[in-house]
Design a protein with these regions (language model features):
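Pepsin/retropepsin-fold aspartyl endopeptidases
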Residues: 1-101
Length: 101
């Protein structure tokens, strides 16, 4: 699955409804967030398991009718480097153990 790293998204991961349904993720609760345009959004939150840095992690998954997004909660403890140019590299690297949550 491809996803976009969204530095303005403070959640863990967002997935579109069809993908959540096909994965059979269990519903957990409703959530509320303020979007970049200032509007409020109410959405469903599910529970998912991801393999991140070779470890399984149980995380909340927000339902959003968009491209899958990786949020800053999942990126906590990692360094993000972006080459801002055509075909630039995006690198995600774990910080030293003492600097991880």
């Amino acid at each position: 699955m491809e996803a976009v790293i969204d530095t303005g998204f403070d959640g863990w991961l967002s997935l579109p409804p069809a993908l959540i349904t096909s994965l059979g993720l269990p519903w957990r609760r409703r959530g509320r967030a303020q979007l970049a345009d200032g509007s409020d959004s109410i959405f469903d939150i599910y529970e998912g398991i991801v393999v991140w840095d070779r470890r399984q992690r149980r995380i909340p998954v927000d339902e959003a009718d968009t491209t899958p997004l990786i949020g800053m909660a999942l990126m906590e403890g990692y360094e993000l480097k972006v080459q801002v140019c055509t075909r630039g590299k995006v690198t995600v690297k774990g910080l030293p153990r003492g600097r991880r949550p």
